[in-house]
Amino acid sequence: MSGKRSYQDDQLDVEEANKRHQMVDTLLRGSEDKDGDNDNSVYDDLLQDPEEVEKENKENRDGDKVGDDEHDVVKGESEGQAAEQSSADQNDENINVDVDPSVTAVARAAQHASQRREAGDEDEDEDEEEEEDEDDHVDIDDVDKDPDAVIDEDDDEEDEDQAQRRRGKKNIEGTGESNDSERATKIGESGSSNETAGADGSGDREDGSQPDGTEHDDEENGGAGAGGAAPRRGRKPGTETGSTAWKQQRKESHKEVERRRRQNINTAIEKLSDLLPVKETSKAAILSRAAEYIQKMKETETANIEKWTLQKLLGEQQVSSLTSANDKLEQELSKAYKNLEELKKKLKEAGIEDPTEEE
């Protein structure tokens, strides 16, 4: 069994070596001029389709198998299995030629070129498929960013807040009603003294204040009123329109306004009396004196303006006359100096001494 097994292994190795040499010879043999450069080089086979090359290799292998009569008939079954195994190995070698060290550099270049073309086609197909997937893809984030959805959530939150406010108001109203019932029972149990105190308290309410007994209860209950609305802290509740307290309040406010107005008038009249030359006591006298004084000041101002205008005109006339007289005197003086110089020259020419120089 061991000798038979080694013989089969040797036969397989021989067949594989022959097939490798045949494949290399097929790649290196002369071929047609596919590039049109009048040169039947080995690189022309690189332009051949890889499928055609594989087909030729299979035909060559089939021819080799038919012409091989040296094998024994007894080992036909094992040879058939070896042929099938060798064909599978040959297909693997045709796909990955660059892995076998017996393949030349030219074969590697041819195989790499075909692999690059196939890889380029596959990449282009994958890119096209990815682009189609991106076109068909719908972004979920864009759907989530819909403004309508956000608005709906805000509306739900606002509705919940409003419902909570309504529940709070109902609770406040319930506490106010319970407090009113407790106050009524306390007032009924109290005697005549409490009734008088209640009457006093009602009078205080008309004036805009609260009784001492109920004020503490209102503070404990959070200031809840009869209608469930709590008044603002630090403020008295408003009085009813048309009541005596309301009328009294309006009367007091009117008096305060009148008092301030009269005070302002008196202050202005006092300042006006200080400006008058004659002091007066009554307001009417002060106002009349002030009117007369102002009228007199206006008349005096008008007279002074006329007087000052006339004086200005007269002064301008006098200035102009003096200016002209001064100009004439200057001209005469210059002429006199010229005549004097001429006389001096004539005296010198006549041999007479100048009497002005001796003096």
From Swiss-Prot:
It comes from the Eukaryota. GO terms for molecular function: DNA binding; DNA-binding transcription factor activity; protein dimerization activity. The keyword Cytoplasm does not apply. PROSITE patterns: BHLH. Residues 120-161 have a biased composition (Acidic residues). Keywords: Centromere, Chromosome, DNA-binding, Nucleus. Residues 55-78, 249-259 have a biased composition (Basic and acidic residues). Its main location: nucleus. InterPro entries: bHLH_dom (IPR011598), bHLHzip_scCBP1-like (IPR047206), HLH_DNA-bd_sf (IPR036638). PANTHER family: CENTROMERE-BINDING PROTEIN 1. Required for chromosome stability and methionine prototrophy. It is involved in chromosomal segregation. Binds to a highly conserved DNA sequence (5'-RTCACRTG-3'), called CDEI, found in centromeres and in several promoters. Binds DNA as a dimer. This is Centromere-binding protein 1. It comes from Kluyveromyces lactis (strain ATCC 8585 / CBS 2359 / DSM 70799 / NBRC 1267 / NRRL Y-1140 / WM37). The gene is CBF1.
